[in-house]
Amino acid sequence: MAKTLAEKVWDAHVVRKGDGEGANAQPDLLYIDLHLVHEVTSPQAFEGLRLAGRPLRRPDLTIATEDHNTPTLDIDKPIADLTSRTQIQTLRNNCKEFGVRLHSLGDAEQGIVHVVGPQLGLTQPGMTVVCGDSHTSTHGAFGALAMGIGTSEVEHVMATQTLSLKPFKTMAINVEGTLRPGVSAKDIILAVIAKIGTGGGQGYVLEYRGSAIRALSMEARMTICNMSIEAGARAGLVAPDQTTYDYMYGRPHAPQGAEWDAAVEYWNTLRTDDDATFDVEVDLDADTLEPFVTWGTNPGQGVSLSSRVPSPEDFGDENAKAAAERALQYMGLEAGTPMKEIRVDTVFLGSCTNSRMEDLRAAADIIRGRTKDPNIRMLVVPGSARVRLEAEAEGLDKVFKDFGAEWRFAGCSMCLGMNPDQLEVGERCASTSNRNFEGRQGKGGRTHLVSPVVAAATAVRGTLSSPSDLDPAPESAAVSSSAA
């Protein structure tokens, strides 16, 4: 029987098949290959094990890092916020008690959990990967079935190394063509979400396919899979190929020698069969895609940067119309305003969506030799300590500092209002993160989701801008279309 990639990975991990079929089917029990843990969703799960007198089933398949609540300045000093300090200390205590490897603040491998896993070679094709975090779908870029789970499910995986789930439907996102300069993976996924809506992927696993996807680097593919959840999907995948293997080869936890050869042979089978069918297929033309930006308060409220803020009257559905009215009020925008005339206060380059080396390089290429708008505050937060060190070895930190940006230590930072990096009430931010909900970056903060190169161009002009809007710099740099 012909199968999609998601079905192949699923079937390879079924420990027990659920009884019944169709709407009456009971959940399957799946084995979990990798469990990633952080300080926010793990305390109750560890406490559940402790109260039940249960051991952690597979400490060797459980990896923890500190990221959500961590400061990105003065990391050698005590954490000021009591709640954040307590959560981080609790994670440290739990990991010590249950024998979990932990990458703490100051550790050479500390960073955002969805950056650390791939860079260490922990994430591999064909795996099942879970984490108590929505954006676990990032790891699907490797052809893994990667899902965010709740705290009760975190405890279940800790206790049994399994997860009870009903099979998902499958959706193909076909992206054909060639991206133009200044257009990136972030623009692809924002366009996809705008097309199918924030609930369009509910109940589905998305597989990203087509020539435009194949042309992307691994870091760009991670950007796309990262935001699958913003379309309502449980997971998003890209079939592994030579690009995947080149990225993984030689990483600390990747197979070596004969084991590598055997792994690649198996990984090459992880692709959707030619005669397999998806429940739904969606097409996107990469040739015509422009830089994309959100105007509202969910990731589906996005338009091309060259267009205008839409009017609620543009929406036929009454719920969408009402949502647009609320969004415009919260964002302090008027319908019909050109997107490129929207002035921002802060630019944030970071998050598990866009904080990897390619993202930093792409942004640095834009700002090199240019001057930051004096009214803009720009935060650059590498996704991991390793990314930070690599960027510094290339001199990127100097590029950002000379531009007037703040160069920070690794962490989730301004992606979410759980650490010191937050917007003030009414502040507007061009952000490379993944969510623009009300208050996401701080109470009353206003967020526009953008790509790294749009973020950089915005920092130069002070208004939402693309690289093509900039005058030539003294030191010009080409913008790679594969940059995330």
Swiss-Prot record:
Keywords: 4Fe-4S, Amino-acid biosynthesis, Branched-chain amino acid biosynthesis, Iron, Iron-sulfur, Leucine biosynthesis, Lyase, Metal-binding. Pathway: Amino-acid biosynthesis; L-leucine biosynthesis; L-leucine from 3-methyl-2-oxobutanoate: step 2/4. Its cofactor is [4Fe-4S] cluster. Residues 462-484 are annotated as: Disordered. One of its GO terms (biological process) is L-leucine biosynthetic process. Binds 1 [4Fe-4S] cluster per subunit. [4Fe-4S] cluster binds at C352, C412, C415. It catalyses: (2R,3S)-3-isopropylmalate = (2S)-2-isopropylmalate. Heterodimer of LeuC and LeuD. Belongs to the aconitase/IPM isomerase family. LeuC type 1 subfamily. This is 3-isopropylmalate dehydratase large subunit. It comes from Arthrobacter sp. (strain FB24).
